[in-house]
Every structure is written in structure tokens, then in C-alpha cells.
UniProtKB/Swiss-Prot annotation, chain A:
This is Beta sliding clamp. It comes from Streptomyces coelicolor (strain ATCC BAA-471 / A3(2) / M145). GO terms for cellular component: cytoplasm; DNA polymerase III complex. Keywords: Cytoplasm, DNA replication, DNA-binding, DNA-directed DNA polymerase, Nucleotidyltransferase, Transferase. Signal peptide: none annotated. Forms a ring-shaped head-to-tail homodimer around DNA which binds and tethers DNA polymerases and other proteins to the DNA. The DNA replisome complex has a single clamp-loading complex (3 tau and 1 each of delta, delta', psi and chi subunits) which binds 3 Pol III cores (1 core on the leading strand and 2 on the lagging strand) each with a beta sliding clamp dimer. Additional proteins in the replisome are other copies of gamma, psi and chi, Ssb, DNA helicase and RNA primase.
Curated annotation (Swiss-Prot), chain B:
CDD domains: PolY_Pol_IV_kappa (cd03586). This is DNA polymerase IV. It comes from the Bacteria. Its main location: cytoplasm. It catalyses: DNA(n) + a 2'-deoxyribonucleoside 5'-triphosphate = DNA(n+1) + diphosphate. The gene is dinB. Poorly processive, error-prone DNA polymerase involved in untargeted mutagenesis. Copies undamaged DNA at stalled replication forks, which arise in vivo from mismatched or misaligned primer ends. These misaligned primers can be extended by PolIV. Exhibits no 3'-5' exonuclease (proofreading) activity. May be involved in translesional synthesis, in conjunction with the beta clamp from PolIII. The active site is at E106.
Length: 376, 479
């Protein structure tokens, strides 16, 4: 193999592909990055049995071929190279990287021992990269982070015709986002549970592309996998087993009061009073007509109080939340105005966004948040 | 360290056994042993008459029975002990706001803080009055130690036992400590004692002589420094009114090892419920769920899981405990199981799924009448009539269970205020016989002992370790 590629192009591609390299590879070859040169393209792949990543970039191919080298090392080297064309060539068991006056000789790993990358499931539809990334961001925030209940570390992707619903929960909040996409088959119906962390990384990496292709195998080949493709990058991820608990009934439909608050001053106020809420002790919210009083801390320690303008329709209510959960939700609604709907102080509250104070709430995104109950 | 002996240590004499003797005239002056009566039970307290035979607390019940076969063996009546303890603690709080309860029958009081005493003379007066008051209100005796530090006050009350008062005048502490065995000092048990003895140190005086460096070399930094300070009678620990509860836990020892995995799971669920009831009773919640398993070979494992927010939801605790149990191999059988909650807080993070599911079961399942320890009893009758517990007969009045078995129950009809009563035997299912609440020990005191309790208390074979954090006061620790 002998190729020539722009330094920036190489560095970016290597950095992305190397991200899914396992920190502690189960087999030595999995620490490698597979470089394949053919038909004017250089493709780089990595795989750790859970996630596979492949990126293709334009390159000048003098001699086609395949080589497996240490991914970490190649990432470090390509990042540090001067901004000049890079030449990569192989000679027996060695690979040589030449750039300007630098020259690196690397050991290669046995290509024949490298596992075959999983087949990308058949394409099932496309969605604009921006839409996909923001939806994933909004939902993954509510996913669980510990492995006690693996199902809760996933984002549920449900496809029904031209609508996609993302949902995740860590049992203290529940985020749901709907968006439209262009399915290949208008009658498609599928459900997948994708590890939230991987999905977040993937969505972020694919924003640069106009369109993201979602490839979800219904049944048969590639089952248990989901694939994403965009901007010359494609990645597959093993799905989590199981499904989230049924959530439709968890979302209350009737409320005793609805509060409307401008998001930015609300967020500022929560952040300020939360300064005295050590280790996520609760922030208490009291809504009365026209004003919201936020309090945190206890009389034994520091205390903080702040008032914010708020519109309230319905009964006055006092309710407390974990400040982190509340702030997560307020940043996720990504709207200038927040709408909080309550039934009682011990039942879940529903957070959604409004484009303006007197506008209707945006139904596409809902963030259900469980309150904190104060004893005594 | 203060210069006046104004720290008081009160230790009730053979508390549980004395309560039993006070409420059962036929047992006065007799050997009484209170504790778990199952095959794996231990002695909680025994009367001084029983101590003559060599019975002491924490001894396996079987050994006690061999040493004192004719003693009365009774199942503890914690409700009653607790209510009497409250009467005593109330008297202590009248003396000073700084009362540090160590258990139901033991507490430190800072007399100076309450202005009850300023010097040796007033301290002795306060101590004497306290002993009289305790006797009037509860009919029981307690021993009082007075000294300038907690350690010495406790040593003094030990020396005062039974039914006495000892005051250690400041300035005489070292001379008094010197000839005493090292085991007198708190923190010196059999192991440290042996260790010191091998180094030729048997008395407190010898510790002082050996010097701090030698002690640290022998016992390590923390223990060495602390012990040396104590040997010089230096103890600056203040009396702390409310010790923070750090965790709430319950455990059960089983008469027979449990092998059945399903049964283990059921027991863990039951313990989780009981633990949550305790937690809720004190208005607390916690983030960390701890499971304790002692296996047939005494190997003891603890596993814990920390939630993102504190909970007092029985479903959440039960679920977490069950998950923890999944990681423990119980194939050889288990003899003890425990469930605890730590990382306590006074608020709970509500859980979506538990609330949705909990609309069906808001409260932890009520404790079924059968307790694990008694589940192996040969007949259900013995479960209903624990030895020593109160009963009422429609005609013969108040009495207590002297024993039961073979379908019969023997009751002695007497009350704290009567003379020695008569014994009658009934069929266990005699409709005229019902469980009753304990009677107050002293007929005419306000409140306290006579408060209604929920019938005979079900008890495991060994005493449940209720408050790992001591105190028992509803204190809160903020994580």
C-alpha cells in the first residue's frame, strides 16, 4: 500500500475512528486501526465488538492495500504532524508515515486476525443531521448512568412510519422527543434500544453532514444492530436487550396548575440558589400568582432565596426538585420560555418549552421530572 | 479538662431483668435471664442473681441454660423497656440539656451545662437526687458515676454497681487508675489486652510508664495515642446531645440455616420492608442500600448500592436489596441476613416507576404474624405466647406467660403491684386468654410505661441491631 493524503483530512479521520477504540482491548488486534486504500478512497475502521466506526476520505492512491496499525499511536502522530501532505506506505511488517521532514516507522498488526466489521443494516431512512443531533441531545440527558439497570442506560428509538420517537429515563425523569424523518418504506415500524452514550457521541460526530441515514434492521441479517451514516462516516452499535418500561401512562394528562417562566432568568436563579444545595439537596419552588420563590439550603447550613416572575394558572403549589435534574430539563427544552405543569407536589411535573410567553407549548419535546419529597 | 466532677454517667442495673422482676413479683430475688430464646439466641441482660452462676450478657442462650437451669428465661418486651427508658431519659433532661444516650439504659449527662452542679458537692447531690427520682418514677435502681470526663464517669458508675454512686474527685484520677487492669480503659478488649500483656503491660499505670512512643509502636498511631491519653486520665470528649444517626439497619439470625434461594429472597424483602418502616418512623431516607449475608460458615459479606437520590420507598429498597442478593452465593445456606440504609437525608427523590407501581402498595407490607425466628417452632401456639409476655384472662385478670408447649400455656396471674400470683394452665386456644399490654411498673406515674403497645412483640432469635448510629434520637446526618 502506498498513499498520499492531506494532513488535516487524515488527522480528523483518524481522531474520529480512534474514538471507538477500546481502552483495554480484549484482543491485541482490536487496538488497531484498519487502513484500507482502494478506488481513490482511504477508509479507516475501528471495532470493539460493541461499536464499529468507519470513515472514508479522499486520498491519492499509488498502490492499493490494507494495513492494521496501533490506533492510539497513529492518532497521536497524525495530530502532531506539520501541515504537509502525509505519505503512508507499507513494507513487509512495517508501515512508514512520512510528512515533511518527519518519518515514523510503525509495527503493523496481523490484518488476517482482525474481525470482520458488522454489516451495516439496510438503510431505513434519513433525517437532517442537525435535527437528529439536537433530538438525541435532548433525550440522552435523562438516561441512567449506572449499570444496575442496563435498560435505563439506553435511548429508545421508536419508528412509526414518518415519525421517530426518542425516549429515555433514569427513573427520576423521563425525556421524550418526536421528530419527522424520511423513511424508505412508509409503513415501517421498529423499536431499538441504543446505549445513550454511544448515541450521543455518534449524533455529535454526524452533525457536519446534511443528512444522517438511520439503518435499523427489522429482522434477519444485522439484527441487534443499528447503523448511522453521514458525511462519509458510518458507525454501527449493538443494541441493548430489553425495552424501557411502558411510559405513556406515566405522563399525566390532567394538571391542577400550569406555570410559565422565562427560561434564562429561571435557569440563572436555580443555579444561584443551588450553590447552597450541597450534593444535590433539593431546590424548593413555591409558585404563587405572578411570582416564583426559589429556596435552597437548610437552617443548619447556608440558605438562599430568590424571586422570579412567573405566570401561574390554577392552584398555588410548592414543590421541590433535585437542582441538577431541573437544570438538565431547562437546558434541554431549548426554548426562551419554560412551561411547568403540576398535579400535586409529590407527583411528576411536566416540563416543556414555549417559543414565547403567550404561545402554545411545543409538543415535540417533553421532560417529565419527579419531585423530591421533604419530610417534616 | 474540667476541674469539677460534673460529667455524670448513669447505668441502670441489669435493666431488662430488673424491669421483669419489678413487673413480675414472683421473680423478685430470683435468677432472671432475658434474651432470644431460640437455639441461636443470646443473653441480652441477666439479673444479679443469675450472674452468680456465671451467666453474662452476650452469652449464647444454651450456655446460660446449662449454667443456670432454674432461672426464668424470658423474651424481651422492648416496648416496655423503651417506655421506661424514656421516663429515665426525661429525668436526665431535667438535669441538663446535654444528655447523650448510649443505649436504652445508659447515658452521659453534662451537669455543668444545665447548671445542675458546679463542684463535687453539688454534683454528688444531683447524682443522689437522680437515683432517688429514678427509683420513685420507675421503681428501678441505677448506678451513677461522677467524674471530670466521660471515660472516668463510666469507670465510676461501673465501680458503683449495683445501686450505688461513685464520685472521682479531680486530681485523684491518675492514682485511682494506676493499679487498674488495662481492660478498664475503653477500647481495650481481649485482643489489645493480650497484646499489651505480652509486652509486659497489665495495669493502667504501666501504660503511662511505657510512654507514648512505646504505645504507638505496639498498637499503631491512632489507638496508641488515644490509649496513652486515657491512661493519663486525659479525655476531652464532650457530651454530645444528639448523636447523628448514620444508618438504619435490621437483621435476623435464623434458627436453622436457610438453603432455599426463594426463601432467602423472601426474607430479604421482609427485612427491607422492616428497615424502611424504621427509616420512615424517624422521618429519614437514604441513598445507600446495604445487604449483609452471614453464611453457614460464618463468612460474612456486605454488598451495597448507592442510588442517585435518597429514598424511603419500600419498593426501591426491596428491589435494590434483591439486586444485591443476586451477586451473593448462598448455596451453603445462610444463618443471618440484614438490610440497612445509609447516606441518610431528610428528603426523598421520588421514583417514577416505584410511584406508578406503588399506587398499588403505598406502605411497606405489614409484618406478618410469624417471625422468621419462630417459624420453625413445633406448633403455632408457641408463637402466640412468648415467655414473659403479658396476657389477660377475662376472669382472672392480668398475668404473664410462664411457659407454653404441647398445646398448653401456663400463666402466672400477678401484676407489678400484687403479691406473688397463682399459676394456671390453659389450652393455647382458650378464648378467654388474650395478649395484653404491659402494665406500668409504678402505679401512679404520669404517662410512660402504660402506653399501649401492639400486643406481644415478635422477635428474632438474636436481638435486632436497630440503630447502628447509636442514640436513637431522631437525628439527621446530611450527606
Amino acid at each position: 500500500m502506498k498513499i498520499r493524503v492531506e494532513r488535516d483530512v487524515l488527522a480528523e479521520a483518524v481522531a474520529w475512528a480512534a474514538r471507538s477504540l477500546p481502552a483495554r482491548p480484549p484482543a491485541p488486534v482490536l487496538a488497531g486501526l484498519l487502513l484500507k486504500a482502494e478506488e481513490g478512497q482511504l477508509s479507516l475502521s475501528s471495532f470493539d465488538y460493541e461499536v464499529s466506526a468507519r470513515v472514508s476520505v479522499e486520498a491519492e492512491i499509488e498502490e492499493e492495500g490494507t494495513v492494521l496499525v496501533s490506533g492510539r499511536l497513529l492518532a497521536d502522530i497524525s495530530r502532531a504532524l506539520p501541515n504537509r501532505p502525509v505519505e503512508i506506505s507499507t513494507d513487509g511488517v512495517r508501515a512508514t508515515v512520512v510528512c515533511g521532514s518527519s518519518r515514523f516507522t510503525l509495527h503493523t498488526l496481523p490484518v488476517e486476525e482482525y474481525p470482520a466489521l458488522p454489516q451495516m443494516p439496510e438503510a431505513t431512512g434519513t433525517v437532517p443531521g442537525e435535527v437528529f443531533a439536537s433530538a438525541v441531545q435532548q433525550v440522552a440527558i435523562a438516561a441512567g448512568r449506572d449499570d444496575t439497570l442496563p435498560v435505563l442506560t439506553g435511548v429508545r428509538i421508536e419508528i412509526e412510519g414518518d415519525s421517530v420517537t426518542l425516549a429515555s429515563t433514569d427513573r427520576y425523569r423521563f425525556a421524550v422527543r418526536e421528530f419527522l424523518w424520511k423513511p424508505e418504506n412508509p409503513d415501517i415500524s421498529a423499536v431499538a434500544l441504543v446505549p445513550a452514550k454511544t448515541l450521543q457521541d455518534t449524533a455529535k460526530a454526524l452533525t457536519s453532514g446534511d443528512q444522517v441515514i438511520l439503518a435499523l434492521s427489522g429482522s434477519g441479517a444485522g439484527e441487534g444492530l443499528i447503523g448511522f451514516e453521514g458525511a462519509g462516516r458510518r458507525t454501527t452499535t449493538r443494541l441493548l436487550e430489553g425495552d424501557l418500561p411502558k411510559y405513556k401512562t406515566l405522563f399525566p394528562t390532567e394538571f391542577n396548575s400550569v406555570a410559565v417562566i422565562e427560561t434564562a432568568p429561571f435557569v440563572e436563579a436555580v443555579k444561584r440558589v443551588a450553590l447552597v444545595a450541597e450534593r444535590n439537596t433539593p431546590v424548593r419552588l413555591s409558585f404563587e400568582q405572578g411570582v416564583l420563590i426559589l429556596e435552597a439550603g437548610s437552617s443548619d447550613d447556608a440558605q438562599a432565596v430568590e424571586r422570579v416572575d412567573a405566570q401561574l394558572e390554577g392552584d398555588d403549589i410548592s414543590i421541590a426538585f433535585n437542582p441538577t435534574f431541573l437544570l438538565d430539563g431547562l437546558s434541554a427544552i431549548d426554548s426562551p420560555v419554560a412551561q411547568l405543569s403540576f398535579t400535586t407536589s409529590t407527583k411528576p411535573a411536566l416540563l416543556s418549552g414555549r417559543p414565547a410567553v403567550d404561545a402554545e407549548a411545543d409538543e415535540a419535546y417533553k421532560y417529565l421530572i419527579m419531585p423530591v419529597r421533604l419530610s417534616g | 479538662m474540667r476541674t469539677a466532677p460534673t460529667i455524670l454517667h448513669l447505668d441502670m442495673d441489669a435493666f431488662f431483668a430488673s424491669v421483669e422482676q419489678a413487673s413480675k413479683p414472683s421473680l423478685r430475688g430470683k435468677a432472671v435471664v432475658v434474651g432470644g430464646l431460640g437455639p441461636r439466641g443470646v443473653v441480652a441482660t441477666c439479673s444479679y442473681e443469675a450472674r452468680v452462676f456465671g451467666v453474662h450478657s452476650a452469652m449464647p442462650m444454651g450456655q446460660a441454660r446449662r449454667l443456670a437451669p432454674h432461672a426464668a428465661y424470658l423474651v424481651p418486651r422492648f416496648e416496655l423497656y423503651r417506655s421506661i427508658s424514656e421516663q429515665v431519659m426525661r429525668l436526665l433532661r431535667e438535669l441538663s440539656p446535654l444528655v447523650e444516650p448510649l443505649s436504652l439504659d445508659e447515658a452521659f449527662v453534662d451537669l455543668d451545662a444545665g447548671g445542675a452542679a458546679r463542684d463535687a458537692e453539688t454534683a454528688r447531690l444531683a447524682g443522689t437526687k437522680l437515683r432517688t427520682d429514678i427509683r420513685t418514677v420507675t421503681g428501678l435502681t441505677g448506678s451513677v458515676g461522677l467524674a471530670a470526663s466521660k471515660m472516668l464517669a463510666k469507670i465510676a458508675s461501673e465501680a458503683a454497681k449495683p445501686d450505688g454512686l461513685v464520685l472521682i474527685p479531680p486530681g485523684t484520677e491518675r492514682a485511682m487508675l494506676e493499679p487498674m487492669t488495662v481492660r478498664t480503659l475503653p477500647g481495650v478488649g481481649p485482643a489489645t489486652g493480650d497484646h499489651l500483656r505480652r509486652a509486659g503491660i497489665t495495669t493502667v499505670g504501666e501504660i503511662a510508664e511505657a510512654g507514648e512512643d512505646e504505645l504507638v509502636r505496639l498498637l499503631g498511631k491512632a489507638h496508641g495515642h488515644a490509649l496513652y491519653a486515657m491512661a493519663l486520665a486525659r479525655d476531652e470528649r464532650p457530651v454530645v446531645a444528639e448523636r447523628e444517626t448514620k444508618s438504619v439497619s435490621v437483621e435476623d439470625t435464623y434458627d436453622v440455616d436457610i438453603h432455599d434461594r426463594v426463601r432467602v429472597g423472601v426474607e430479604v424483602g421482609r427485612l427491607a420492608d422492616r428497615c424502611v418502616r424504621r427509616l420512615r418512623a424517624s422521618g429519614l431516607s437514604g441513598r445507600t442500600i446495604v445487604l449483609k449475608v452471614r453464611r453457614y460458615d460464618f463468612s460474612t459479606l456486605t454488598r451495597s448500592e448507592t442510588l442517585r437520590g435518597p429514598t424511603d420507598d419500600p419498593a426501591v429498597v426491596r428491589e435494590a436489596a434483591a439486586r444485591l442478593l443476586d451477586s451473593v452465593d448462598t448455596t451453603g445456606g445462610v444463618r443471618l441476613l440484614g438490610v440497612g440504609v445509609s447516606g441518610l437525608a431528610d428528603y426523598t427523590q421520588e421514583d417514577l416507576f416505584a410511584q406508578a407501581a406503588g399506587d398499588r402498595a403505598e406502605e411497606p407490607a405489614e409484618e406478618p404474624g410469624t417471625e422468621p425466628a419462630e417459624a420453625h417452632s413445633p406448633s403455632p401456639a408457641e408463637r402466640r405466647w412468648p415467655s414473659g409476655h403479658d396476657v389477660r384472662h377475662t376472669e382472672l385478670g392480668h398475668g404473664w406467660v410462664q411457659g407454653s408447649g404441647l398445646g398448653r400455656v401456663t400463666v402466672r396471674f400477678e401484676t407489678p403491684y400484687s403479691g406473688v400470683g397463682r399459676v394456671r394452665t390453659f389450652l393455647v386456644d382458650d378464648p378467654e386468654l388474650t395478649p395484653a399490654d404491659p402494665l406500668p411498673l409504678v402505679a401512679d406515674t404520669e404517662g410512660g410505661a402504660g402506653q399501649p403497645s401492639s400486643g406481644p412483640l415478635p422477635l428474632p432469635a438474636s436481638l435486632p441491631k436497630s440503630w447502628s448510629g447509636g442514640g436513637g434520637a431522631a437525628a439527621t446526618s446530611r450527606p
